[in-house]
Every structure is written in C-alpha cells, then in structure tokens.
C-alpha cells in the first residue's frame, strides 16, 4: 500500500492553523515524499546554497536554478532511501563511535579536536551540525558496505587473469580522471524515445566539442551518479573503473571526448579530464596484535571501553600480559587463540579506524581503546617493515581492483533498485503551480 501524503499535509495544516502572537514567519513545506519520509523545502534550499557556495569558492559556473534543483532533489532522494534502509536494519552510529571518528579526522589534520571545532565554527558551521553531517556520512558508508558487498563475487579466475595482466604491464599503469555524462532513457523505451535520447546526447556532445564547460553541462544534463559533482570520477586505473569506461578509454589522451556510447541505461559521453602515471613503491607492512570486545545487550558500549581501559592498566603495570588477556577475553575468533596476533599485513587491509590507529603508533606502543564497526579494540604495534611488491601483493591488488570496479557498478544497481521500489512524489514549488 502506498503511503498517504494526506496525514503529512494534515499535520502541516494543523501547525499553520495554530494562533501565534509572533510576527509571521515563512512556512516550510513538504517538497518530496519518499515512502513514509519527507524532504522539506528548506533542506533543498540549504543544499542548493551549499552547492552554490562551493562553486563560487572553486570559481565554477553552474547551470540554471531549475537544473540544479533537479540534481539536488535526486541526491536527497537517494540519501534518504539509504538512511531509511539503515534504520530498517537497525544500523545506528552511536556517539562513542562518532567521537572516535572525529578524533581520527583531527589527528589526520594534525589538530586537536578543540582546534578542529574552532576551525569549523569559524567557517560558519556549528560543531553540532558537523557531528550530525559526519554521522550521516558514516551511516551511508556503512549501509553501502553492508548491502553492496554481499552482492559481489570475485572468482579465482578473475584474480589470476588480472594478476597476469599486472605482471605484464608492471605497476606503471595510467590513472585516469574521468568526466561522465549519462543521457538516460525510460524503462523499456520505444524507438521514438530512443531517438529522442540519442539526439539529446549528440547535442550535448556538440556543445562540449564547441568548448562548453564539462562540469556545468554534467550538472545540467547528466543522470549519472556523479552529476552533482560535475560528472567527475576521481583517479582510477583501467582495472578499477566501471567496465563501460574501461572498454572505451584505453589509449585515450587528456582532453579526449568519447561518445555517445549506448548502454541499457542510456547514452554516455566520457571525457578524459586528466591522466597520470602510477609509480611503483615499497610496501610498508605492520605486525600487530589486538583485543576485541563486541558490545551487545549484555555488554554495553561503556562497559566494553572500561574493560579495555582496565586491561591497559594491567599490561602497563606488569600485572597481566597482552597475549594472555587476548586469549581470555578477545572476541576475534581469528586471533584470540594466537594471543591476539594478526601477523604481517598492510594497514590498509583493515577498517579505516583500525588502520589509522596503527599508523599513529610507534613500535611496541599500545593504543587507547577505540571503536570500529566490529567493536571496541586495543591494539599494539609490534614491528614495521618495508617489502617489495610480491606475488601475494599482486594477488591482493588484483582482488582490490576487481572488487572496487564491481562495487561501483553494484552500488548504482542497488540504488536504482531501491528507487524503483520506493514510493516517491515530488511536489512542485508554489510559484510553479497553476
């Protein structure tokens, strides 16, 4: 059954009808209904203002207000659908995990949290707003990881094939920054609809070849996933990027415009915004051990953190050994029996919070308790070493490249499926109504 918008409008009508002695204020309105949720006009206005401010700061031109509004509404719809999914599966980012993320960001920027707060507030954003924006970003990242990762399979044959290619090419591949515009077509289009989309794509291509700004054109015309970023995909090598890109850009040079290319989604136009060579380098590996406690209905967040703080005191005083506590208490089945030992690995294979913590430690140092998606940890950095790229590295690299390519493709498929299954209604602004 489709959600009814009448209750929503009734609540707003009730709010409007209440007497007040204050001066009249502009009344916010429902701009979009997404399943049982809504997007307010003020949310759209605020996001448009943010995009415009960012464009001014970057000296970047923008399309018409109506085209920009369409892109912003689409972004808000997809964001809200993902947050609704997170809520349905019980995914919530708590304050302790959020605090840990903020500490990591401050550390990366070589600031204290207080200094970072001061900088944020000097730029006109309250620290409370920043926290909630970051909580939303972390939630989106986690729900994408949870929902998309399980849709991806990387076969041994794919890895073997790519390892062979990597060995043939070496690690001096080229990374491309891609500009992408998608002129979409309706579901099950007829010949007239296909022809209309094809003409639109060719018209866009001609404007680009005549020197029209790519980013502005993408924001105004593209239905692709990066439209609001000017259609720009960050640097990827040919093995990381979506298959459609990889099939057409091999050998292309900076500034080349390719297309239109027809696919099931529509007509694609691709521009090589930049290209750079990959440099080979030594790999830094770390040997570490950790103790993991997983919060549960029996073990609260605060209790898990307090237990690890107590373990730290016992280790530092010589009352207990790290490996003994790991065997007794750690809830990581892969390392607990080995005294928490994780073996040699690149830090980047771990979740971001764990990798950032390892990178901040000196040899033999034990971290303070910190939170990741897996739970609460303390970790000790035992050794660092530099190694050359090995067969195992090539295998890991191949898996990572294939996974990233498939993740980008499956993420868009997942978003498209959610949108197709959702009840969405966009209400026209008052000024556009007859």
From Swiss-Prot:
Residues 173-274, 283-383 form the PpiC domain. The keyword Chloroplast does not apply. GO terms for biological process: Gram-negative-bacterium-type cell outer membrane assembly; protein folding; protein stabilization. GO terms for molecular function: peptide binding; peptidyl-prolyl cis-trans isomerase activity; unfolded protein binding. It is found in: Periplasm. Its EC number is 5.2.1.8. One of its GO terms (cellular component) is outer membrane-bounded periplasmic space. It catalyses: [protein]-peptidylproline (omega=180) = [protein]-peptidylproline (omega=0). The PPIase activity resides only in the second parvulin domain. The N-terminal region and the C-terminal tail are necessary and sufficient for the chaperone activity of SurA. The PPIase activity is dispensable for SurA to function as a chaperone. The N-terminal region and the C-terminal tail are also required for porin recognition. NCBIfam families: PRK10770.1 (NF008038). This is Chaperone SurA. It comes from Shewanella sp. (strain MR-4). The gene is surA.
